[in-house]
Structure formats: structure tokens, C-alpha cells
Swiss-Prot record:
Cofactor note: Binds 1 zinc ion per subunit.
Subcellular location: Cytoplasm
Family under the similarity heading: Belongs to the peptidase M1 family.
Active-site residues, Swiss-Prot/TrEMBL: 297, 384
One annotated Gene Ontology cellular component of this protein: nucleus
Organism annotation: Chinchilla lanigera (Long-tailed chinchilla)
Cofactor: Zn(2+)
Main EC class the enzyme belongs to: hydrolase
SMART domains membership: Leuk-A4-hydro_C
Protein name per UniProt: Leukotriene A-4 hydrolase
Amino acid sequence: MPEVEDTCFLTSPITVCRTKHLHLRCSVDFSSRALTGIAALTIQSQEDNLRSLVLDTKALTIEKVVINGQEVKYALGERQSYKGSPMEISLPIALSKNQEVVIEISFETSPKSSALQWLTPEQTSGKEHPYLFSQCQAIHCRAVLPCQDTPSVKLTYTAEVSVPKELVALMSAVRDGETPDPEDPSRKIYKFNQKVPIPCYLIALVVGALESRKIGPRTLVWSEKEQVEKSAYEFSETESMLKIAEDLGGPYVWGQYDLLVLPPSFPYGGMENPCLTFVTPTLLAGDKSLSNVIAHEISHSWTGNLVTNKTWDHFWLNEGHTVYLERHICGRLFGEKFRHFHALGGWGELQNTIKTFGETHPFTKLVVDLTDVDPDVAYSSVPYEKGFALLFHLEQLLGGPEVFLGFLKAYVERFSYKSITTDDWKNFLYSHFKDKVDILNQVDWNAWLYSPGLPPVKPNYDMTLTNACIALSQRWITAKEEDLNTFNATDLKDLSTHQVNEFLAQVLQQAPLPLGHVKRMQEVYNFNAVNNSEIRFRWLRLCIQSKWEEAIPLALKMATEQGRMKFTRPLFKDLAAFDKSHDQAIRTYQAHKASMHPVTAMLVGKDLKVD
């Protein structure tokens, strides 16, 4: 493979210049829904005689650009759809190789910035104060500030953020104090420092009426006060997960590991913003059963945040390794059979995704080609679960979990603070297992890495915990009408929450069931009363796919009350595919679109073919 090119950004490539540091001074204005401020970028030339450079921007208003106290010329290029507009800056004097320059750019964000969601007080739990959060992954940092918006560039950052004094600002950095705003007594300035170099997709900001509880020696959980106790209980295992992760990955270099529980419109399960993981409130099940998402985000502190994919084509390097670590953490906590149970559940998710895309779809390849493709549109479970399956398969080929964890720790050590490609990973795998090259050569690398569809080999899974889920799902799938009275509530008595969820996942793979079956399932198991978001999601999909009209309002409610795309997109798709709810689904989307997260609104619109 030739040297990879990042096709998602418009900025000068890393062979021309590299951003080393950002100092951000900005003010958050809820009335105009804008961040206004100055981004001071320390940029190092990578070549001699550098006279100009290009940064990524998206829907930004640029007021001026200053170098050494002097305004300099700049030009904003044409908007290129999802990529935004290139911004070319002329340097007053040519730079030689390794010379640095500080470029101060005065900017303002758009109220429609794809990186930011501005919530009205009514959209928060407290109903009193507005709320702002950012989501920069994959290529939305450019919609917050001008930058080299590529994961191949890593920088440190410091920030000073002015907000209304009744609110709290947090960033993906260590908190560095707060002071009254000297320019406005009704405002406060919060300061931050991120000393570890990070790709700019990990720059994050939240502003809201936030409170915190200490849940570990290096962990506070933050949320609005209405959720803070519940969150502290739900995520109490965080420190034990961190300790296991350090044992598997090496020292935790980030200092603090805080958690932030966001309002329901947050589009992902979690986002691994350093020092401050963002998570969806749909994890608040009340029984810690969805804490694997925390294990996942913790694992990113090594795979993703220390060792980073060089371009989004290689996103599986971030996610496959992180799922692999996540499942080892859960295995240490709950047993090896539990690790296999989740691994097999993940294979099922991969099957579903490939079925949805179609088995020849290019997005089902592990290494994708994102030339002229918005990474948000390509996003799916493939990099997570196909990536995990490859690593799990290699674990089984190369001598088991301990052997492969040895490789993983060495891999993190070798590539920490770097951005790498699949070839870098593969070359290191071969050098680490140099005595097992014969085994590695048996792997069909082309099929695994570059071919669409299911992987060429299915790993071996311990079935102990899955068998009961399969058995019960088969009873329902094969039941005739006269068999329905053989089901009762005790069917679930010996199943864990995870197994009930897997039972529904198994039924859903064979859906639709006859409507009478689904009605009987509600009679005996009362799934409508279950609040666990994963179970509720699969149950409502099953109801809609079986054309149960009574479930329509429940499914619409779940699709709009929260905005985690994993739930919202399939629910809207199922509702649109059912003739009795098709029009209502589209009307509901159109009514809620303005209050949805910008990425969610865009993707649901595409799914429903209305935008």
C-alpha cells in the first residue's frame, strides 16, 4: 500500500506543516448560539521555504488572522459539502524546516455548526438553564475552530472559556481553575490544560448546570443534578475497570478520568474525550448492566487516544482494539465465559450490519476508502465488530488471550503518541510474532482487511451463556399458535439482563414473528415495562417488524425522547417501513428535526429519504 492520504481534510498535509499546540480563548453566547474567540495555533513547518498553509474550516466566520502582532492575508475557499472550506493563510516571512509560528485566528461559529448542539432549558432535566455540548469526531472540529482536522496531527492545548457564571464549563483536559470574567461580572472564565498531544477530534467542550460526585480516586461523575446520584451508582465500577485497563495497556497517562452524563440527544453511546468521557443517559439502567460502554471508553485511553488511526479509512484500528480491550476488562470482572458471550453477541451485530448494507457494500470492508465519503455516513458496527473478530481470531491462532494481550501491550508501547495505518499494525504484528510467521501467513489478509461482507473465518466461541438465549428464541420462532400457552414468566427467571437482551437479539434476527406471538410475549414477559434501553430497543423493533400497531406510539417515543443513533435510526427506519406508521414517522421526524443533534438529524433524514 502506498503512503496513505487523508481524503477527509482540505488542510496542508503533515509533510508541509504540523500543529503542535492550540491556545483557545473563547466566549459562549447562548443567545446567538455561537462560540466567539481566538484560536492561537503553534504550527511547525515540515519543509524549507514555507510561504503559506491551509487549514480546515466549516461554516466559520473569520474576523482576522494575526502573526507577530500583524494582520496577515487569508482566503477562504469554496465550501466543499461536508468537508467545509479550506482557509489559506499567507505567512509574512517564509519558514524554514522545523521553524514554528503562532497564528492567531479570530473566529465565530455558526448557530448551525455540525459540531455543536445548543439545547434550550426545556431540553434539559433542570428546565432552567441552556446547555451546550460538542461532538468533533470524526471531522467536525473544523466547525468549532480552524485546524488541521486530521487524526494524523497531534497537539497539546490550553483553553480559557467564558460562560454565564451560573453554569459550569468542562473540556477534554485537566481543569486548571476558574476566575470571574474581568470584562463581564455576570460571567466566569474556566481554564483547561491538556498536556498530552491529541488529535483535534478529541477536543471537546460542554457548558451547563453541572454538578459532580466523586466515585473514585481519579474520577468525578458530572451531570445535571437530577441525574448525578443515579450516575454515581451506575458507574461505581469505574476505578476497578481503570485498574484492569492499566494492567492490560500500561500506565494511564491522562491524570484524571471523569465521566459526563449528557442530555438524551447525545448521538453516541459514549465518546472517549480525554480526561472526560461523554456518555449517553441511556446507560442509566439502574443495575450497572450497560457499564461495558464505560469499559469501552476507558480502553480508548490507550487504543485511539494514545495510538490513533492515521486516517478515518483505518478507523478499525481505534475501534477493533478498543472492543478487544473492553471485552477483556469485562472478562476479568465477570469471567471468561462472559467475555465469549459478548464476543458472540458482537458477531451477531456484525451479521445484522452486513445484512443491512448488503454483503458486497464497500462500507463492510474493514479498511474503507473514504474518498468523497462523509465518515458519518460510513459509520457502523463494522470497524468495531469485524475489527474485534480479526483480533479474536488472531488470539486463537497465536496461543490464547495471555499471548495476544502481550502483543497488545507491546503495540501500545510502540505506537503511543503516534498515528498509524493498518500496514504499520500488520508489520508490527509480524515482527512481534516473528517465530510464528508461518501461522500468520495462513491468514487471508486480503479477505479480512480489504474485502466486503462477513470475515473469511468465524472465531470459536464458548456457548455456555448464549445457549439458553438461543433455546428460548428457538421455542418462540418455531411455536405454533397452540403452543403459545406453554410460555410463562418463569422462562426468564434464570436469565441475566444481558441474556434477556441476547434472547431478543436472536429473535430479531429471525423476525418478524406472527403478531399473536409478540402479543403473547408481552402478556407473559411484560417487556413494555422494562426500562433497560438495549432491551426496550430490541423489543420495540420486534413489535414494529411484526406490525403491532399498539407499539407505534411507544417506538416513536423512544426514537425521539433520546437521540442515541444506535437506537433512533433503526427505530425510525422500522417505523417508516411499516405502512401503518410510515407517514407518522416522517411527520414526527420533521417535527423533531430542529431539536435533534445535527448529525442525527442529517442521518435520519437520509434513512427516511426525506432530506
